[in-house]
From Swiss-Prot:
PANTHER family: ENOLASE SUPERFAMILY, MANDELATE RACEMASE (PTHR13794), MITOCHONDRIAL ENOLASE SUPERFAMILY MEMBER 1 (PTHR13794:SF58). InterPro entries: Enolase-like_C_sf (IPR036849), Enolase-like_N (IPR029017), Enolase_C-like (IPR029065), Mandelate_racemase_C (IPR013342), Mandelate_racemase_N_dom (IPR013341), RHMD-like (IPR046945). It comes from Bacillus subtilis (strain 168). This is Putative isomerase YitF. Homooctamer. Its EC number is 5.-.-.-. It comes from the Bacteria. The keyword Metal-binding applies. The gene is yitF.
Length: 371
């Protein structure tokens, strides 16, 4: 299966209103799709996110010339070379070559990986809670209410981007709106030190619906993570920027996390992403993929979760949920899956089992201008 053509699709959308987290406001969303085509006509799609000018130059000047003429079945060695140049680009290539392998074998991605344990996966609605409005709390509450009406039973909201007192006011308002039957995840984006993060414990002891506390501290403080995990009454999660299982090993060995959160687009390819999930099972901790930046990478996270052994024997709580971006972002619809009552059914067709929405691709193609 010789690679004969590679197409690129840099996509850009400027937001109507900025939204954000503790790292600041987002004013646009981007996506970079690639399509690898073999001499037999079998194709596969990949996705990554980074600064579009750098990605486009990297693909057109180096990665595409390197891949042309290579065998699509040599995924591991090709991805290993590309990750030395650009890790996120390597992840996109990994996805595309995985789909080609599945189509060549006349099966789905899940079947290529040995088959699925389950037909559907739970997802949680992921919010960027902060806005530049003085009434940001009421706006956040309205956004959450709208998604709860669509059937979501788990949500993730942001903390750590404003004063502790104001964050508490925000979460109390959401608790009043959502009720204790809705699982709530709090994501601090590494904003705190250990003392500030521990202040939340007084509220965790009252709120019975907290799913986990996500990335409360920078990861250069593993001893504080271990201490915090031992003292909090809710699970501690994190690791969305880890590049592979080797970076998780010291964190898991020191018992820093209850839940690891690898991201398909942040690790060194889909194979290492799956290695991260399996590593969690070996250490007896949970794995809930971070999947905020792209719909195709989220689909691969869903495939991997479908093929992952259960973490528990508890009925209706044996597999961890996957993140589902519900903010303004047209690229979330590049893949035509939609949750129903907080669950997503896994496609069964060949390859990824669905088509890329070319209408969205054509509408939002980046024109090369500065942003």
């Amino acid at each position: 299966m010789k690679i004969v053509r590679i197409e690129t699709f840099p996509l850009f959308h400027r937001l109507e209103k900025p939204y954000g987290d503790a790292n600041g406001f987002k004013r646009y969303r981007t996506c970079y799709l690639i399509r690898i085509i073999t001499e037999s006509g079998i194709d596969g799609w990949g996705e990554c996110v980074d600064w579009l000018p750098a990605l486009h130059v990297g693909f057109t000047k180096r990665i595409i010339p390197f891949l042309l003429g290579k065998q699509a079945g040599s995924r591991l060695s090709l991805v290993r070379t590309i990750q030395k140049w650009h890790q996120r680009a390597a992840s996109a290539v990994s996805m595309a070559l995985t789909e080609i392998a599945a189509k060549a074998a006349d099966c789905s991605v899940c079947e290529l990986w040995g088959g699925r344990y389950r037909e559907e996966i739970p997802v949680y609605a992921s919010f960027q809670s902060y806005s530049d409005s003085p009434q940001w709390i009421s706006r956040s509450v309205s956004n959450v209410e709208a998604q709860l009406k669509k059937g979501f039973e788990q949500i993730k909201v942001k903390i750590g981007g404003t004063s502790f007192k104001e964050d508490v006011r925000h979460i109390n308002a959401l608790q009043h709106t959502a009720g204790s039957s809705i699982t709530m995840i709090l994501d601090a984006n590494q904003s705190y030190d250990a003392a500030a993060a521990f202040k939340w414990e007084r509220y965790f002891s009252e709120w019975t619906n907290i799913g986990w506390l996500e990335e409360p501290l920078p990861f250069d403080q593993p001893q504080d993570y271990a201490m915090l995990r031992s003292r909090l009454s809710v699970p501690v999660a994190g690791g969305e920027n880890m590049k592979g299982p080797a970076q998780y090993v010291p964190l898991l060995s020191q018992r820093c996390l209850d839940i690891i959160q690898p991201d398909v687009m942040h690790v060194n390819g889909i194979d290492e992403f799956r290695d991260c999930l399996q590593l969690a099972r070996y250490f007896g901790v949970r794995a809930s993929a971070h999947a905020y930046d792209g719909s195709l990478s989220r689909l691969y996270a869903l495939f991997a979760q479908a093929c992952l052994p259960p973490w528990s024997k508890m009925k209706n709580d044996h597999i961890e949920p996957i993140e589902w971006d519900v903010m303004e972002n047209p690229f979330t619809d590049l893949v035509s899956l939609q949750p129903s009552k907080g669950m997503v059914h896994i496609p069964k067709g060949k390859g990824i089992g669905t088509e890329i929405n070319m209408e969205i691709v054509n509408r939002y193609k980046w024109d090369g201008s500065a942003y």
